[in-house]
Amino acid sequence: MNPAPGSSIIMIHPSRFSVPLFEILQGKYSYVKGQTLHSSLRNPGVFSRQLFVHLYKRALSRCTYDEVLSDWQLFEAGIRARWRGSRYESGAFKASTFQSWVDTVKMTLDQLLLNNIYHILHTRTNLSYERYVDWVVAVGLVPLFVSKPDRALVKSITSKFSADSVGFSSDKYKTMKTVLMTFKRELTSVLETVTSIYIPDFSEVQLYFDGSTTAYFGVYRGQRITVEVVNRPIIFNGEVTFDSPVQRLFNTVMSCHRTAEHAKLCQLLNTSPMKAVVGSTSNNLYKDILNHLEQSSHKSDPKREMLQLLIKLAENKTVSGITDVVEDFVTDVSQNIVDRNKLFGGGGGGPSAESTAQGLKKQVSGTVFKCLTNQINEQFDTIHKLEKERDMMLRKVHTLETHLSQCRAEDKRLGEVSITSSLLTTDTLKSLLNIHDSSLSLHAASVNKGDNVHNSFFSQYVPPFREVSQDLTSLWESEVFETFKLTPVIDNQGQRLYVKYSQDTVSVLLGPFTYVITKMYEMELITDVYSSLSLNEIADGLYKSSRLYVYMQDVGAKYNLESQEYFDAASAASAAAPAAGRTQSPSAFSQQAQHGPP
């Protein structure tokens, strides 16, 4: 879809404003160390942990006290039947029995939920958290293509969680059956959502802004799709400025890239060997040659005479001047010529007989004029060929100008307003051409003999691109840290090991993805503590804060006081763990980071 001329619809993407931003994220321009923070930012493990927390909490939230009590009574009766004659009422027996039940319930939950959720989180679906982060960081807009859920995938996964398949078909294990059915229903809802939403890649979609409705929409495979606005861009005079980190870094990134490109050009130019031939541009150079010949030999030298003739012919531009040169040459040479007719007689002997000097003059003049005539004819042929080439080049230039006019008209029709190019961000070779066309262009100048020439281009100059890269690294880190509030995890030496989501990062980045993109309104955002813990650690914390654990604690308290003491100690330990996680300093997190984030 292309906007019609005069339409209020403006193409936002792809354009010269948006495509370079995604190319920067892909490392096409000046990929520096600080940009690796973006890889941590787009880590899909954070959303996977949130899905895990949601599924695990929901699975344990539907069980009832009666179901827990019924399962406990059934378990306790089975223990009594197997250990007849034992001291059923002893504290040790009761504590051992209840502890066995608690541990087996936990192991069953891990086998039923933990292992299967691991498998689900690694199932390939349409929804991509990484592409969502790329769109937010680049342009602040997220296109969404909503289709029908993948029923085949949903059925293949949820079929594994029927009561019959896991051995809960009888009236026993009421608690586990409730957990299983609740988990299956919630899993079905989540899978239908994540298989029906697709975030296209930046090369697959076009984004537009409708000025009449002030709304954004996209086109994906010929279909109109929704565009969610996370950070609204600014459109002014046909130019689009995105409210995004990469937009703010764009000029600095391109400046660093062009500086490195300039350094590469200097390296290539300075690597090749260079030689300079120094000589005088004076027109009196041939006179120096004649003086040298005269000084080297005082005798008459035919080569010197011929060279002198050629030089004098080159100096004269008129026919009369050339005639005078020939006459002077013949006069000088004839002084050394013996006229055979005068000496021996004969040869006609009449007054009209041609002398040797006259014959020489006639022959030299004829030869010279013949050479000049041939040269003039060659010049006319060359001029004729050049005229033909000129006509051909004019036709080519006219054709190129016609194509250029058509391209400019097409750009204007698409709403592309011409803007002044920046010397820092445009192509280096084009920038050099612009410099040569400007008033700063170099001009030729004559250099007097004996003077020295100082030209900086002959020095091994390389722009300081390393310092620029270091500055860009610091700017990347500052922009990402301040925009998304990431938390660095450092060791005792002050070295950063990795970064993790803070609570502000969860709210700023994961919140819109959960509630605006996927529209999972019943899902709670995870805390920053869970963003870097392993799934086993998260499962332990969720289990000890669940409704099931509270009911089991109450049953144990009423069954045996010793079990109550056990639960009190476990509760104190579980309460201390999250508190320690919330108050832990970055250096303390280094103990968890020895193997990196999970």
From Swiss-Prot:
Location(s), subcellular? Virion; Host nucleus
Question: In its UniProt record, which GO terms are filed under biological process?
Answer: chromosome organization
Q: Where are the transmembrane segments?
A: none
Q: Which cysteines are joined by disulfide bonds?
A: none
A cellular component term from Gene Ontology for this protein is: virion component
Keyword annotations from UniProtKB, A to Z: Coiled coil, Host nucleus, Viral genome packaging, Viral release from host cell, Virion
Keyword Lipid biosynthesis among record annotations: no
Pfam families the UniProt entry points to: Herpes_UL6
| Oligomer status and interactors | Homododecamerizes. Interacts with terminase subunits TRM1 and TRM3.
HAMAP family hit by this protein: HSV_PORTL
Q: What does this protein do?
A: Forms a portal in the viral capsid through which viral DNA is translocated during DNA packaging. Assembles as a dodecamer at a single fivefold axe of the T=16 icosahedric capsid. Binds to the molecular motor that translocates the viral DNA, termed terminase.
Q: Which family does it belong to?
A: Belongs to the herpesviridae portal protein family.
Q: What is this protein called?
A: Portal protein
